[in-house]
Amino acid sequence: MKGKMLLGLTAILMLTGAAVPVKADDVWKFDAQRFVLKEYTGTETDVVVPDTMDEGVPVKRLGTQLLAGSETLTSVVVPDSVTILDVGALSYDNNLSEITLSSNLINIGWNAISSNDALTELTIPASVCIIDSYAVSGCYALKKIVFEGACPLIGSEAFVMLSDDVVIYVPDDQIEEYKKVFEENNKNLNIQPSGKPAVLYSAEDYLDTENLTFDAETGSITGYNGMNTRLTIPESIDGVPVKAIGKRALWEDPLLGYVTLPEGLEYVGEDAFSITDTLKYVEFPSTLKTIDKKGFSSYRGFRLDLPDSLEYIGEEAFSYFSVETDLIIPEGVKELGPGAFSAASRLQRVFLPSSLEKIGDNCFSRSPITYVYMEGLELPEISDTAFDKCEYLRDIDLNEKCTKQQMLDVQALVDTMGLECRVWRNQNTEVEHAYFSVEELPDDPSKLYLTGYEEEAAKVRR
């Protein structure tokens, strides 16, 4: 009977021309398990994104291309419940002129606010920690960008294809930090003081101890039931030091974007953070020694800053990871386990320390590496499959003081893998200028050797 009454009321409203109210659930597709809005089917020009769905479940993410490609959308208000803008969430909207972002936003994803032709101003809330590559790009009408907090991590191409007239206003007490970051990214942008101090957040603001499960006997975090996107793990719980992140403690978390691990932590366990596809940055402590099997598998990080205390990177610890910067393994690491950096989709340059003793089976296999540098005079034990299917690998440079025999041994190894790669002795830091030339080998005139020059760091290959 109730259903018939509703149908009758709807018919009357349609006949009289009265508007039929539309519930949020009717125009938004929501994944309650991952707290993400995935689709919008409404026709409003001014959209206020709901902060809850499905009878009270908080909206934490705007999904991939959620409000992209609209010709009619003119304004969007993102509620304070939202902490993540996924890829292209607010992009390619030709008439979108006003965006109000969440005051709790942590991560502005790749291409998230791009190619919006009518957008003239944008305010980045103080809570934002990460702005990924191309996040605010191709908005040629944009004249004013205001940052309210400390300088976040900013992708190298985060602010590109903007008007020459755009001015970036930053807190007065943070201007040098912002200038440094933009200069490091080779962006010559007009940065001016905003006239206000920064609204600052500390790591302690993101503690969520009550939602962590903890094994006091082993000092291990064993699980997390909270909804933080930025999360700080405490140094101790109820007086017991946190020494480890246990097996699958935070794996497949749908919201984690920025994690601070505590001083005193020594071990990250198997699958601890694996398949956490929103994770963009980890602050590692100076005490960490081991990252075990698949500890950060599928890490799609903004960058990877491993600590000098690290000694062992386990089997597939960073397999399937995607990081757009160079991979620098810190001095102190002794072993890279099997498949440790396999199938790393954006990995191109790798720098290995003199402390390294072993590179395991398939360590870098199926990764698009083009260049490897080995610092040590004593070369590590290298598996004959370490660089298997690295079809783009062209150069491996050894320390300048390595012997010719070491160079030939590594060359023989890559030859057995069928790679079109040359091994060189390199990195002569005492040479100020070296120019390209080709000369014959004295013992075999049919073969040539090359001396090379790189503007940023002079090198001689021999």
List each model region and its residues.
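Positively charged n-region of N-terminal signal peptides that target proteins for export
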Residues: 1-8
